[in-house]
Design a protein with these regions (language model features):
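Active-site-proximal structural segments of metal-dependent nucleotidyl cyclase/transferase enzymes
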Residues: 237-255
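Catalytic-core segments of nucleotide cyclases and related cyclic-nucleotide turnover enzymes
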Residues: 249-278
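Juxtamembrane segments at transmembrane-helix boundaries
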Residues: 16-33, 47-181, 198, 204, ...
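Short aromatic-rich membrane-water interface segments that cap or initiate transmembrane helices
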Residues: 1, 184-194
Length: 279
C-alpha cells in the first residue's frame, strides 16, 4: 500500500505541472484560467505541508495547509463559474470558507477533535464541488463541447462522493483515539481514492481551456470575417452532416433544389453584408 508521502506528493506534483500548463495559456484570455492557476498553486503548497505534522507547529503543519485547501476549493469553483460566463457567488462562498477556517482552528487549539475537523473540511469541499459541477453543467456563453464539460462535472461529482464517504466514515469515530484514526484501514483507502481523483480534478481545466480555444478557432474559420455569415465550406459540411448523401435514384431533384436554393440564399446574404460594410 502506498506510503502517506507518495499519496500526498503525487497530487502536489500534478498540481504543479497543471499550474505551468495553465500559465502557458494565460494569454488566451479564456475566463477562469487565473482562478484555476492560483487554485493549483495553493494545492501544490498545501499538500506537502501536511507531511510535517510532527516537525512543525500545528499552526503551520495542520491549520495553514487546510486553510490553503479551503481557498483552493473556492478558487476552483470560481474558475468554473467564470469559464461558463457567470460570476462566482462570493457573498455565500466567502463567509462559508471563513466559518470553516474558524471552526477548524477551534477544533485544533480549543478542543482537539479530529473527526470534527475532517467533517468540516469534507462537507465544505463537497459543497464547493457540487457548485462547480452545477456551473459546468450549465450552457456556456462561448461555443464549447458539452462532452468535456460533462466529463469535468462527472469528475467533480466523483470527488464529491469521496469527500462525503470520508465525512460519513469519520462521523461516528471516537475522538479520543487521536491520530490513530488516520491510520485506520478505512481512512487509508479513502485517502488513496481521493489522491487518485485529485489529479483528474486538477487536469480538468486544461481540457476545458483547450476545448474552448479549439471551438473559437473553429468558429473563426467557419465564419466570414467581414459579415460574420457562415462560410461556404462550413455550410457544405453542415448540410452533409444533417442530410447524409443518398443514392441518385432516391435523392431525386428535391434534394438538389434544396441545396441550390440554400446556397443561393447564403450567397445573397454574404454579398449584401459586404455591400453594407463597404457603404
Amino acid at each position: 500500500m502506498p506510503t502517506p508521502a507518495i499519496t500526498i506528493l503525487i497530487p502536489s506534483l500534478t498540481s504543479l505541472i497543471v499550474t505551468v500548463l495553465l500559465a502557458s495559456l494565460r494569454s488566451s484570455n479564456v475566463p477562469g484560467i487565473a482562478d484555476w492557476i492560483w487554485s493549483n498553486v495553493l494545492l501544490a503548497v498545501a499538500l506537502p505541508l501536511l507531511l510535517f505534522r510532527h516537525q512543525l507547529p500545528d499552526a503551520i503543519a495542520i491549520l495553514l495547509p487546510n486553510v490553503l485547501l479551503v481557498a483552493a476549493s473556492a478558487l476552483y469553483y470560481a474558475g468554473c463559474s467564470r469559464f461558463v460566463g457567470k460570476r462566482p457567488n462570493w457573498p455565500i462562498v466567502a463567509p462559508l470558507a471563513a466559518g470553516v477556517c474558524a471552526g477548524f482552528a477551534y477544533y485544533i487549539f480549543v478542543v482537539d477533535h479530529i473527526p470534527a475537523r475532517v467533517l468540516l473540511i469534507s462537507c465544505y469541499s463537497s459543497v464547493l464541488l457540487a457548485l462547480a459541477a452545477e456551473r459546468l453543467l450549465t450552457r456556456p456563453v462561448r461555443p464549447q463541447s458539452t462532452r468535456l464539460r460533462d466529463l469535468s462535472a462527472a469528475i467533480a461529482i466523483g470527488s464529491l462522493l469521496v469527500q462525503v464517504a470520508r465525512a460519513v466514515y469519520f462521523l461516528p469515530l471516537d475522538a479520543h483515539a487521536g491520530e490513530l484514526l488516520f491510520m485506520s484501514k478505512g481512512n487509508v483507502v479513502l485517502v488513496i481514492v481521493a489522491a487518485a481523483a485529485l489529479p483528474m480534478l486538477s487536469m480538468a481545466p486544461i481540457m476545458l481551456v483547450h476545448d474552448a480555444l479549439l471551438a473559437e478557432a473553429r468558429h473563426a474559420v467557419d465564419r466570414d470575417y467581414l459579415t460574420g455569415t457562415m462560410s461556404r465550406r462550413a455550410f457544405e459540411d453542415r448540410v452533409e452532416r444533417h442530410f447524409p448523401p443518398q443514392p441518385a435514384h432516391a435523392a431525386g431533384q428535391g434534394y438538389e433544389q434544396l441545396y441550390a436554393q440554400a446556397d443561393a440564399n447564403l450567397y445573397t446574404a454574404k454579398h449584401s453584408g459586404r455591400n453594407r460594410v463597404a457603404a
